[in-house]
């Protein structure tokens, strides 16, 4: 079938809106009509060429919502007409990782997904006979996409796709990191480095967890009003100080902050976040994705004296079994999604959405099909 899509033909180049061919779903696969998709920093990261797993030409997009059109052989968990959110972190329920009960990092389709392919090692997309790669198992920058059954969360059909599509990545990642990775407790102190969608979601999650002091940190003060709306008690612009942000936080509490979250992908900020964590029990959670080849460092004494460095992917959330409940929470107002959507656009305007993001003028732009 034909589908309009925004295709990245080469790194560092604007996306091109073209009509592509989408092949039918094979065994264990599902064809979806995408209704909405967010434009995320991870898409921009891959488009920049810095992503070690980036392959081109590719249909990007991984933060979407849509409706099932057709199912392949053996698919039982969804049927045509079901409303779904594609998952870049699958949940098969059968692999060693799923059965461990310790992680959400299912490996059922990981090997082929990282190569831009479907589980059988081929692609369902082509343009003028040339194969196009899939992206993160989702490829929501196409009006129609094919996704593995294990990479789909079935959601309430009454949910507003313009909002709940954000649960496909950023908001779930931030809120989940608070509850599942850090396990923030009432009255704990929290510092959030970077107030993009993920950082703001961390702030909201910290409020849900009834954290005491919630410190929001960003060099763009225009984001502070929204941070306060989501629950920040303090907003700090590092550029307002003539000393490192770590020292600013240690002035607030000489022993440090209970939980710090790095939501940028800057290895220097990752170190500052770790060294701002509370002596004896503080933990720092890395959520931001750093560029290819970059490494983190700190003095071992920082860990010897009780600090813990952690990472979080998709907020530790198991997509098929847990994400539908987060959609219900959003429908009840327990998760506030609407303020994240600062712009809505058509697919033809998608390059403008990337410009807004790079200029710091948007939190999330949602593309409507």
Curated annotation (Swiss-Prot):
PROSITE patterns: ADH_ZINC (PS00059). Zn(2+) 2 binds at residues 92, 95, 98, 106. Keywords: Cytoplasm, Metal-binding, NAD, Oxidoreductase, Zinc. It is found in: Cytoplasm. Its EC number is 1.1.1.284, 1.1.1.1, 1.1.1.-. NCBIfam families: adh_III_F_hyde. This is S-(hydroxymethyl)glutathione dehydrogenase. It comes from Escherichia coli (strain SMS-3-5 / SECEC).
């Amino acid at each position: 079938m034909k589908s309009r899509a925004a295709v990245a033909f080469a790194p560092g180049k604007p996306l091109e809106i073209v009509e592509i061919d989408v092949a039918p779903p094979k065994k264990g696969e599902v064809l979806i009509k995408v209704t909405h998709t967010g434009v995320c920093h991870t898409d921009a990261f891959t488009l920049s060429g810095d992503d070690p797993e980036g392959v081109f030409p590719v249909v990007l997009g991984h933060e979407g919502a849509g409706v099932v059109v057709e199912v392949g052989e053996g698919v039982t968990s969804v049927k045509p007409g079901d409303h779904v959110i594609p998952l870049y972190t699958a949940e098969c329920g059968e692999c060693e990782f799923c059965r461990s009960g310790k992680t959400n990092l299912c490996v059922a389709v990981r090997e082929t997904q990282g190569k831009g392919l479907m589980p059988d090692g081929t692609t369902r997309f082509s343009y003028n006979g040339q194969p196009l790669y899939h992206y993160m198992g989702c490829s929501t920058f196409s009006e129609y996409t094919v996704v593995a059954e294990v990479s789909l969360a079935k959601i309430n059909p009454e949910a507003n796709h313009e909002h709940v599509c954000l649960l496909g990545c950023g908001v779930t990642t931030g809120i989940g990191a608070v509850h599942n990775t850090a396990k923030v407790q009432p009255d704990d102190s929290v510092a959030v480095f970077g107030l993009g969608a993920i950082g703001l979601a961390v702030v909201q999650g910290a409020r849900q967890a009834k954290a005491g002091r919630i410190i929001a940190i960003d060099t763009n003060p225009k984001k502070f009003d929204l941070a306060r709306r989501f629950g920040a008690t303090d907003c700090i612009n590092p550029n307002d100080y003539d000393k490192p942000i770590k020292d600013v936080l240690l002035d607030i509490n000489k022993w440090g902050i209970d939980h710090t979250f790095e939501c940028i992908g800057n290895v220097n900020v990752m170190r500052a976040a770790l060294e701002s964590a509370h002596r004896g029990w503080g933990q720092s959670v890395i959520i931001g994705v750093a560029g290819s080849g970059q490494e983190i460092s700190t003095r071992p004494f920082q860990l010897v004296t009780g600090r813990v460095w952690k990472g979080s992917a998709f907020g530790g959330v198991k997509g098929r079994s847990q994400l539908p409940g987060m959609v219900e929470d959003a429908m009840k107002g327990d998760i506030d999604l609407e303020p994240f959507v600062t712009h809505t656009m058509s697919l033809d305007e998608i390059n403008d959405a990337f410009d807004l993001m790079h200029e710091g003028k948007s939190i999330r732009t949602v593309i409507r099909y």
